[in-house]
Every structure is written in C-alpha cells, then in structure tokens.
Amino acid sequence: MSVYIHMGVRMRRSLTMALSLIIVAPQVSAEALRAGAAQSVITPELPTEHAVYLAGFGHNRVASGVHDDLYARCLALEIATPTLVVCSVDLIGLFYDDVLTIRRAFQQKAPAASFLVVASTHTHAGPDTLGLYGPKPLATGIDGRYLDWVDGRIASTAADAVRAMQPALLKLGRDDHPLLELLQGVDRPPRVKDPFLFTMRLVARSTGETIATLVNWSAHPEVLGRKNTQITSDYPHWVRAYVEKQLGGMALFFSGSIGKVSPLGDQVALLDPETGKLAEDESWRKAELLGTEIGRLAQRSLQNAEQVNLNSLTVQSEIVFVPMQNSHFRAAAAAGVFVGRKPLYSGGKLDPAKEKRDLPDLGRVEYATGHDIQTEVDYVRLGAAGTTVAEILTIPGEIYPELVNGGMARYPGADYPEAPFEPVLREQLKTTYQFIFGLGNDEIGYLIPKAEWDEQPPWLMNAAQSWYGEINSLGPDAAGSVLGALVSLIRPY
C-alpha cells in the first residue's frame, strides 16, 4: 500500500499557474470498501439582533423565518488508507478560502483522512455566504460569526462521517428519462441542458441497510423565487425526503451543471395531482412536486443499479489561478464585500493592491488590481477490477451545460465570435457514471463559453437587451482556465 503525493508549480496555456495533488489507492480486496455518513443543521438562528440577508436574487432580502432547516451532509468513502469525504451544504456557495479553513479543521479532527470536497447546493433561500446580497451594492451581507460557525460545523460533520464508516457495498445508478429534461428551463441560447441524473447508494455489508444515497442533477434551487423570505433548501429538501423515506439512510443532493438552468418559468410545468392544475410558479407546491419527482427518478435509477466491487480510489486535484475580469467583483473585493475570503493574486502571490477608479454604475470607488483568483478542480476515479467505473468532477462555479455535454454555438453579436471552443467535459470521461459536482470547493460564478460571451451590444441573436450571465462571471477566460485544468487531469487516464 502506498500513497503518492506530488506537488509542483508549472505554467500552461490559459492557466497562470497550477499546483497539483494526486492521491492514489492501489487495487485492494473489494471487501476493503468502507462508508459512513453524517449530517448537521446549519440554519442560522432567527430571530436575531441583526438581519440575515438571503442570497441569490439581489440586495436587501431579509429572512423572516425558517421553512425547513439547512444541512451539511457528508459521505465518507475509504479504500485501504485513502479516505475521500464529499459534503453537500445548503448554501448559495462557499469561497475557496472557506473550504481551506474547513479542511484544516477537518484534518485536526480526522488526521488519517486524505481528501475533502465541499460543494454547495446553491439554494437561493439561505444566508448570504458570499457577501454579494447585503443591504445595498458594495455592502456585504456576510455575518462573519455565522460563517465561521458553519465552517467549523462542516468540518465536524465530515469527521463524524469518517468515524461512522463501516464495511459497505456500492451501487451506481443513472437515469436518462425524458422527463428530466422537461424539468429544466433554459432561456439563453444555445438552449442546451444537462438532464442526466446520477446516483450512488452505499449499503452496509453486514445488514443490507442504506448508509447513504447520493443524488446528482442540474437545476438552480430557486423555485420559491425572489419574493420568498423564508429560509429553505428549496426543491433538494423534497428530493432528500423522498429518497430517505423510500430507501432509508441519509440522502445527499449535489447540484450539477446549473449555469443558466432554472426550474422557474413556463418551460417547467408541473401538474399537481391533488388539484388537476399546474402548480403555480414560485410556490411551495411547485418546489415539493419538483423535488419529489427528482427523488422518484433517483429511486428509479437504483432499481436496476449496478453493484460495483470497488477496490481503487484516485483523487487528483489542481489549484488554478483564473483571471479576474469582472469590474464589479474587483470593486466588491476592494470594498470588503468578500470580507477577505476571496483575495486576489498576481503571479501566484497574494496581491491586496487597490486604486481609485470610476465605474459607470458605481461612480468613483476603490478597485482591487490583482490579476487572478485562486481556485481548485478535482477529478476522482472509482475503480473495480482494474477498470474505472465512476468519475467525479468538481466545478468551482456554475458551468453552462454546453461545456459539459457539447452544443457550443457561434451567434451574431458575440464579443469573441472566433474564439476556439473549450473542451467538452463528458467527451473526456470514460464511464457510464459521470458525476458533476457544481460549486465544488468554491463559487467563482458562471462559466460561459468564450465564443458565446456577450458583454457589449449588439446582443446575441440581435436580442433587444443583454442576456443574463456575464454580470456574475469572472470573465470570458474563466471557462477555458477551469476546463483546461480539468482536462489535464482526465486525459492521462
């Protein structure tokens, strides 16, 4: 048994700099697989002496109550020595620096564990953990005490999952049912979706009882809309509730390729069997129906699940420096909106420099001048009998589906109409079970194909107004930086 760890610095096209980490478990007996699960509530206390700003729809949306609790849910997988823990948290997102803080605390609590992934579901009805949704522009919405508590809570939950590990069997599921695509709305061209649903069920070897079921699907958790002021995990709440009722154990939900994919609007029409009418948009009933349907399809995917005698686990990780090309984010960084949790770098080193600049819609403001932000991508391979049987990619933001499934297009009005297309992720993957963990270990915003980037008029397809997306992206080179790093991890295998 050996673990190979390599860390180095190198230059490559589209990346400023990269650090790589490889953790390998060689093939061992199939009986060596162990799994454990744990969960904890991370809902902020209400009422409180100060406002809890809700994230996702703009400024000054203050929480008025709690509909359902927010959770950190963690699954630990171990083959021989390497232990991988994946955590899904009901938050709009966590910055990479928070994840590094969580990892340090986790290592103290579970020093033998090898690697931790923390992915946010991206609920639009949870507390602002990014700072962008405070009382007004350039005023943070982060409650530092709450966020520090959440970081510690996630670390403890991950360690609890490790302590709960027991001999386990792994079952893998996938569903391509046409309904999955109908439950996703896309307004921006090209109207490409990522409808695939992937599941992973861990069963106790001794009893046959479910330890945990992992569900991976793609749509923004924003069914309740901007008028809602109650804290909720949105439709993933009902996904998990259905799966746990049917299969037992703990359910985890991971958002996938959610860039520009929404369940809001007329594209996603859900018939309420109790009334015989369509569920109203931005309603609790629509959230319940959507989540329950995804839960049902998740259970369906496992009816003929492939039981895998897992005997190898490999984690590859790379730190990536992505150019910061968003003026609003630079102003936010300089104003303290990110409260120091998303610093800028130049040449791979922290760069706190800032200057005064005039911005069209903000006036004269402080402006951070560092070149890049630091983030991470991961590639996990699960193997059996010398063959990779399942793969996990972490995406540090909200990736447009055409970057995952293909279908990138060139339209009149694009700012970079001749830009080369980025590599398509699923074309690089080898297995039937291709898990995409969006907002994995970071939230850097939308990842948009450069050839479709449209920040200046004329707009794509001669639209009368700008398309939504660019305002919440690091810039036109972000997708290429992230996908270039991922492909470099995948291709050798």
Which residue stretches match the model-derived regions?
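N-terminal secretory signal peptides that target proteins for export/translocation
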Residues: 1-11
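N-terminal compositionally biased, intrinsically disordered segments and leader/signal-like regions
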Residues: 6-8, 17, 122
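Sec-dependent signal peptide recognition
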Residues: 12-20
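Repetitive helical segments and hydrophobic/amphipathic motifs
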Residues: 21-22, 131
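N-terminal signal peptide c-region/cleavage motif recognized by signal peptidases
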Residues: 25-27
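Non-catalytic substrate/cofactor recognition surfaces at enzyme active-site rims
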Residues: 31-493
